[in-house]
């Protein structure tokens, strides 16, 4: 977790510097308080997944860019093991493994997400044109799409426009594991 906080602090400082944004401007663009952004930059706070999404959306960068440093790709083959990279931001009931972090040439990022029993997260809309693809690997979960919760079980999938409110929850007694492919529109301003 400490490594993630250090990376997050460096990434946030770097983006602000690159754009010439003050903490006030960053707070306005992300919807995250100036105090919280300052704590994150100093490595004093472990933000929730929801807060990380707000920051990524405000800066118009991928979510995975805040989870781990960009990987230097050696050739066209990239092997990843979810168990080796799984993290649980801010002690939430969701574990995140960025299987394929965002690369501009592909336009997407792929996560393995684990929802612990009882966990629920409703997400604010991402930037216009973002699409999510959810594929359940094991367990039972529900997805909030177009204002309605829909159950999904192992082997089922849904694709939806993520530039609208949406969410995920696990009302069961066992973890629910799914892949989430997030596709970004071609005209992204930064990355």
Regions found by a protein language model. Name each.
Residues 20-35:
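Short alpha-helical DNA-recognition segment
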Residues 50-65:
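DNA major-groove recognition helix of helix-turn-helix/homeodomain DNA-binding modules
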Residues 81, 85-124, 180-185:
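A short glycine-rich, His/Asp/Glu-containing loop-to-beta-strand
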Residues 94-95, 106, 154, 162-188:
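Ligand-binding loop in jelly-roll beta-barrel domains
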Residues 123, 143-144, 150-152, 166-172:
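Short beta-strand His + acidic residue motifs that chelate non-heme Fe in jelly-roll/DSBH
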Residues 147-161:
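Short acidic-glycine-tyrosine-enriched beta hairpin
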